[in-house]
């Protein structure tokens, strides 16, 4: 039985990935810096699942975690808001650099069969449509400078392994803006989670900027599906994971506002960010990847999840 290590197993993507891998009959070792109570549920009591606490900034711990596995899905990351990323970038940069470097090197030394690295849309320069092969011809957006570069370095490390050791046993996935029902609804929440929280609790639904920027969103469940696909198909070229369809921030706000019966207030004193950011999905399409969770359904799932948390 193939043994898969999933880092970030308590996170938004990791939880879906754990469930999918178990459903497919893999042995799953989940690791995260925090334990999620969901793993106390009876369905995780079987012999095919093991959760282990793991701080990936500790290289020795990474070596221990990969010791008996065949495959690694490196999904762990550092969550946070664009504001914090801009004002306190080293809260992200150094921890991400350490955990990506440690886990990739540990996996190489252990001789794992396959390694999937979760990169980000932030590696791309400002453009209306992002194509995978454009990354190394350009620089990340100024709005994603630190997060973009640290994720690029993770990609570069795997390229380094290929050049130095002849290793080509890895996949790189670059998700668009991820959202889902296991998101963080605190101060560091992402766009959709933040809007749902405001819609539920505030008199007005306040939106940063004028709401015109166009973004590409993908549900965490579809990201998990893409990660699993990249491993099972042994995809060795970077692939985008997104919808390929743009949606304005104001359209997302409208879905949330309609659900809660709230008016929308646009705070034009706040920055819009890049005007348009879409994934080119041609390559992913060629491998048969198509997102299954449409945006409106996904947002309603987030709303239902958040409302459940408030009970």
Would you name each region that the model predicts?
Residues 4-24:
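N-terminal Rossmann NAD(P)H-binding glycine-rich loop of SDR-like oxidoreductase domains
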Residues 82, 117-131, 146-152, 164, ...:
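Conserved catalytic-site region of short-chain dehydrogenase/reductase
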Residues 101-144, 171:
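Conserved Rossmann-fold NAD(P)-dependent oxidoreductase catalytic core, especially the SDR/UDP-sugar
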Residues 142-171, 199-201:
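Active-site Tyr-X1-5-Lys
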Residues 56-95:
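NAD(P)H-binding glycine-rich loop region in Rossmannoid oxidoreductase-like domains
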Residues 84, 137-144, 170-184, 194-218, ...:
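A conserved pocket-lining segment of Rossmann-fold NAD(P)-dependent short-chain dehydrogenase/reductase
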Residues 200-311:
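C-terminal substrate-binding subdomain of Rossmann-fold SDR/epimerase-dehydratase oxidoreductases
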Residues 72, 86-115:
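NAD(P)-cofactor binding segment of oxidoreductase domains
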């Amino acid at each position: 039985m193939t043994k898969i290590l999933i880092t970030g197993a308590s996170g938004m993507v990791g939880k879906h990935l754990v469930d999918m891998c178990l459903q497919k009959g893999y042995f799953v070792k989940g690791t995260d810096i925090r334990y999620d109570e969901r793993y106390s549920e009876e369905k995780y009591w079987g012999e095919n699942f093991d959760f282990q606490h793991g701080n990936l900034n500790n290289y020795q711990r990474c070596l221990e975690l990969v010791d008996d596995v065949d495959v690694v899905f490196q999904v762990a990351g550092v969550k946070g808001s664009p504001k914090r990323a801009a004002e306190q970038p080293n809260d992200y940069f150094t921890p991400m650099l350490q955990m990506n470097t440690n886990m990739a090197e540990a996996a190489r030394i252990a001789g794992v069969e396959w390694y999937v690295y979760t990169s980000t849309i932030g590696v791309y320069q400002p453009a209306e449509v992002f194509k995978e092969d454009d990354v190394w011809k350009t620089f990340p957006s100024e709005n994603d400078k630190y997060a973009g570069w640290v994720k690029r370095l993770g990609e570069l490390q795997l390229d380094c392994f290929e050049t130095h050791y002849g290793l080509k046993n890895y996949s790189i996935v670059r998700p668009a803006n991820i959202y889902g029902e296991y998101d963080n609804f605190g101060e560091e929440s992402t766009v959709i989670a933040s809007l749902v929280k405001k819609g539920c609790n505030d008199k007005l639904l306040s939106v940063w900027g004028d709401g015109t920027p166009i973004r590409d969103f993908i549900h965490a469940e579809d990201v998990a599906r893409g990660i699993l696909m990249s491993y099972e198909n042994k995809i060795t070229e970077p692939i985008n994971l997104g919808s390929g369809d743009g949606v304005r921030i104001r359209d997302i706000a409208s879905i949330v506002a309609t659900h809660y019966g709230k008016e929308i207030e646009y705070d034009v004193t706040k920055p819009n960010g890049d005007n348009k950011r879409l994934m080119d999905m041609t390559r992913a399409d060629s491998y048969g990847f198509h997102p299954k969770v449409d945006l409106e359904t996904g947002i309603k799932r987030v709303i239902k999840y958040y409302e459940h948390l408030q009970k």
